[in-house]
């Protein structure tokens, strides 16, 4: 570990940080010390997450130390020097003094897009000097509820049943939270991610969901998904306190869209009809005394049900009155019309609280009905409870003025669907129904409500935020600190080419008017076929959209190009469903890492799962091909209205983008994000190939990430491209492919696992290790969690390592010096369940037979596909009998595991 002092704050870092990491941490500290907001861009692979965590927690640690000194000074004063406040403070218990509300210590809130990204950040935290800090993560009941009878339930029904059981104290797991929250077995775990708290919950029989809410009260840093912060309804439900908090939005390139969507909603005529039928059915049940319906506790009466039904009937009538223009484009109304619409139905700013309260009581009651037509229902009523809360987020004239500026109500005809098998007695689908889209076009609308909570600082950070000015203008946040960092890699590690024509000289242009051109599609396919012959290992190909990707796939299969490409590299296509996606990703990694093959191709779409959240370091992504610019659908009503909104804003404030500038930037940002899947650390290298002539436009080039702009080169013909790529990969392999990672003072890659050596047909490349068990590689939300690369062996030997490229004494001593318990835990964490069972069986057989040859043969079988974990084998020496130690040592030396 190394300690650097920046802006008066000592920061313990796993290695000597690079200059760009120091600059990044200085900007973070500037935000925290000056209580201002920051927008910080640093490319993927520059150690952004590590720098963010270390600088933030170092600042918090200093605040803690200062507070501790102040307490000691208070304790040393004589009686006459105490004020009444000091006496009061002195009488507080240690627990009270440590509470964040009493201590005045700010809480760090770290939010990212997905739980897999949060999990990666928490694993990063565990490997720092700040692993003694208290950290927890907030998740949904789907992730954290372990009650057996609700195990198979999801979504709204699970939430309702949980709330009911808590209310009636019929959940034995919830009832133990209060008792167990101060248990040393719980409080003794500093960093608790979702897996940790679920395991502890199962062990100690408490509810992980409610325990997480308790733990956040004392946590130094709380991890949570974006929507927990940006959705006002969820934020209130989760009781997230933002006063004096430091809020970090990592991977914030999507924050504008998320803010808009959190403040938007949709109402269908069929939703209103279903709500009417839900209320009607309850009224009928209450009138039927034979069902003993009145025996159940209720917080509503028949008159209230009648009033609620009348509201929905009136709302249905008012929606039906809205006239639609002829054609599919629909009708656009001012945003404030939503207040008029609900007002005519009887819900206003003055009474909406009572309406939402009534709906909540009804929904809660329906949760108690476990059988019959009401079981598991009330979903539409619950939806309207949330809708009304969003509509009436504010009630002042100023709020309505903002709605008038930032919102539009777009109404279209509802598609008539076949009636599904439903619990309701009558058909809900009807002709002439409408869809009301209440769209927010200002990210600042939601962000302002967040900022109004009194937070200390807001830090937005990502690898792709630029240009910063329009982002800041749209979010309407006062930003005091800005940063656009360069990349950590050199020009020899990146080859960026714009390709305007294929090998047959056919122009490559995936514009709306050319994407159906068979000549273009064929030329694109031939371009990819040729490139697979010079690009080693893993190749990513991103298309602007699913339809375009499927169109290309279909044509290439018909003309034989698909089979030709597949003969070079196995092709995998990004599916839309979770299970198929996980399977495709697992197979792709296996093919890339198979030394008998030439690699693999993964075809995906910009803004898809692959382009947003995954790490294709080293051989997993030696090149990325972008086949076109992913512009939003030009004729989409929401896109049209967004462009108009921005044009109006730009007319009065030039800091705002014009509509067409935003439209272009949407495509460029998606491309930048897709490109960020490769070049993941300081020793990585790869090619970025832009196969669309439009990339040669100066405006588009100017919207690419800062670290790419000066590296972009246009190649006039395909032959020159092939020659340049051969030379690039040959030189990069010589300079970086077999790089030995020994302990040194140089800074390693901050974010990902150490790669193993991959030997292909022509090259000897580095490729990141992939766990053989899909259960370790796949996250619950459909994202693939690539195991993050630990600090390479530049770190001190005391740092836990999963793999070393060149085994060395320091690493082996680290394994050998562990206790028996620690060693077994280390092996269990590294191996999948099946391999660990085989491992323990091999030890048992050796213990029973004393045959060391059988032991080494078993180890060879277990670790054959896990060569990156063979460093664990020498740790078995303490288990080997004295008479076998020499033979075991020889085995380790022969396999390069001991010097």
Please describe what each predicted stretch is:
Residues 241-269, 273:
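SF2 helicase catalytic motif II
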Residues 2-15, 19, 60-222, 227-230, ...:
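A substrate-engagement module of RecA-like helicase motors
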Residues 741-899:
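Acidic, Ser/Pro/Thr-rich low-complexity regulatory regions
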Residues 194-219, 230-239, 352-506, 522, ...:
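A contiguous, basic/glycine-rich beta-loop/short-helix subdomain that forms a polymer-engagement track
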Residues 449, 507-544:
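Conserved interdomain hinge at the start of the Helicase C-terminal
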Residues 502-519, 572-698:
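Conserved RecA-like P-loop NTPase helicase motor core
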Residues 546-575:
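Conserved helicase motor "Helicase C" RecA-like lobe of SF1/SF2 P-loop NTPases
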Residues 1-41, 51-54:
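Conserved pre-motif I regulatory segment
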């Amino acid at each position: 570990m190394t300690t650097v002092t920046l802006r008066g704050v000592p920061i313990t870092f796993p290695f000597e940080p690079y200059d760009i990491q120091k600059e990044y941490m200085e900007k973070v500290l500037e935000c925290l010390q000056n209580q201002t907001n920051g927008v910080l861009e640093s490319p993927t692979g520059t150690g952004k997450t590590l720098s963010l965590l270390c600088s933030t927690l170092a600042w918090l640690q200093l605040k803690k130390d200062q507070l501790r000194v102040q307490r000691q000074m208070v304790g040393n004063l004589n009686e006459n020097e105490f004020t009444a406040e000091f006496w009061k403070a002195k009488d507080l218990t240690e627990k009270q003094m440590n509470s964040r509300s009493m201590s005045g210590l700010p809480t760090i809130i770290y939010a990212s897009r997905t739980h897999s990204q949060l999990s990666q950040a928490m694993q990063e935290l565990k490997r720092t000097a700040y692993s003694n800090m208290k950290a927890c993560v907030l998740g949904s009941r789907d992730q954290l509820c372990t009650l057996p009878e609700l195990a198979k339930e999801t979504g709204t029904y699970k939430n309702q049943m949980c709330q009911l059981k808590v209310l009636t104290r019929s959940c034995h797991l919830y009832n133990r939270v209060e008792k167990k929250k101060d248990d040393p077995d719980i409080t003794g775990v500093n960093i608790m991610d979702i897996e940790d708290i679920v395991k502890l919950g199962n062990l100690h029989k408490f509810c992980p969901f409610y325990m997480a809410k308790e733990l956040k009260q004392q946590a130094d840093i709380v991890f949570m998904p974006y929507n927990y912060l940006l959705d006002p309804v969820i934020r209130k439900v989760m009781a997230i306190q933002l006063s004096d908090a430091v809020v970090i939005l990592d991977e914030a390139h999507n924050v504008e869209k998320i803010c808009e969507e959190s403040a938007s909603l949709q109402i269908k005529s069929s939703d209103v009809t279903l709500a009417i039928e839900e209320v009607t059915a309850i009224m009928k049940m209450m009138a039927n005394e034979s069902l003993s319906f009145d025996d159940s506790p209720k917080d509503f009466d028949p008159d209230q049900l009648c009033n609620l039904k009348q509201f929905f009937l009136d709302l249905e009538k008012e929606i039906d009155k809205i006239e639609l223009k002829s054609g599919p484009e629909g009708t656009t109304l001012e945003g404030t019309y939503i207040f008029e619409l609900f007002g005519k139905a009887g819900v206003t700013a003055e009474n909406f609280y009572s309406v939402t309260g009534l709906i909540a009581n009804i929904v809660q009651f329906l949760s108690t009905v476990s059988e019959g037509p009401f079981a598991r229902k009330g979903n539409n009523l619950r939806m309207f409870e949330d809708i009304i809360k969003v509509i009436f987020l504010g009630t002042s004239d100023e709020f309505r003025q903002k709605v008038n500026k930032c919102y539009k109500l777009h109404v279209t005809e509802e598609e008539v669907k076949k009636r599904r098998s439903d619990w309701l007695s009558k058909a809900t689908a009807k002709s002439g129904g409408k869809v009301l889209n209440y769209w927010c076009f200002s990210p600042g609308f939601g962000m302002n409500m967040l900022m109004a909570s009194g937070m200390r600082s807001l830090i937005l950070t990502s690898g792709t935020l630029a240009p910063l000015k329009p982002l800041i203008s749209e979010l309407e946040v006062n930003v005091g600190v800005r940063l656009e960092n360069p990349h950590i890699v050199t020009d020899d590690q990146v080859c960026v080419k714009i390709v305007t024509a294929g090998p047959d000289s056919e122009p490559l242009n995936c514009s709306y008017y050319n994407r159906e051109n068979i000549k273009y599609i064929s030329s694109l396919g031939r371009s990819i076929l040729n490139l697979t012959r010079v690009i080693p290992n893993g190749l990513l190909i991103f298309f602007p959209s699913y339809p375009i990707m499927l169109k290309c796939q279909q044509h290439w299969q018909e003309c034989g190009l698909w089979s030709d490409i597949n003969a070079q590299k196995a092709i995998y296509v990004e599916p839309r469903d979770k299970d198929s996606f996980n399977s495709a990703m697992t197979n792709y990694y296996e093919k890339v890492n198979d030394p008998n093959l030439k690699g693999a191709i993964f075809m995906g779409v910009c803004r898809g799962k692959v382009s947003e959240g995954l790490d294709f370091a080293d051989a997993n992504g030696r090149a990325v091909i972008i086949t076109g610019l992913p512009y939003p659908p030009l004729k989409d009503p929401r896109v049209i209205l967004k462009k108009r909104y921005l044009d109006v804003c730009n007319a009065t404030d030039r800091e705002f983008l014009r509509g067409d500038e935003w439209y272009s930037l949407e495509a460029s940002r998606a491309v930048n994000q897709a490109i960020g899947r490769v070049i993941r650390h300081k020793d990585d290298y790869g090619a970025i190939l832009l196969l669309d002539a439009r990339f040669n436009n100066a405006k588009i080039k100017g919207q690419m990430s800062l670290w790419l702009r000066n590296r972009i080169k246009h190649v006039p013909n395909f032959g020159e491209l092939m020659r340049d790529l051969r030379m690039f990969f040959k030189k990069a392999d010589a300079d970086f492919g077999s790089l030995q990672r020994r302990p040194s003072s140089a800074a390693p890659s901050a974010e990902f696992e150490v790669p193993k050596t991959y030997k292909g047909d022509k090259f000897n490349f580095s490729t990141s290790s992939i766990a053989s068990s899909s259960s370790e590689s796949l996250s619950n939300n459909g994202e693939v969690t690539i195991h993050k690369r630990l600090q390479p062996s530049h770190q001190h030997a005391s740092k836990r390592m999963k793999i070393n490229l060149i085994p060395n004494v320091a690493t082996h001593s680290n394994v050998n010096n562990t206790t028996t318990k620690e060693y077994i835990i280390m092996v269990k964490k590294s191996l999948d369940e099946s391999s660990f069972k085989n491992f323990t069986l091999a030890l048992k057989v050796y213990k029973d037979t004393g045959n060391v040859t059988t032991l080494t043969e078993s180890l060879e079988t277990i670790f054959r596909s896990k060569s990156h974990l063979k460093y664990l084998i020498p740790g078995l020496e303490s288990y080997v009998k004295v008479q076998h130690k020499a033979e075991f040592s020889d085995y380790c030396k022969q396999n390069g595991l001991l010097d």
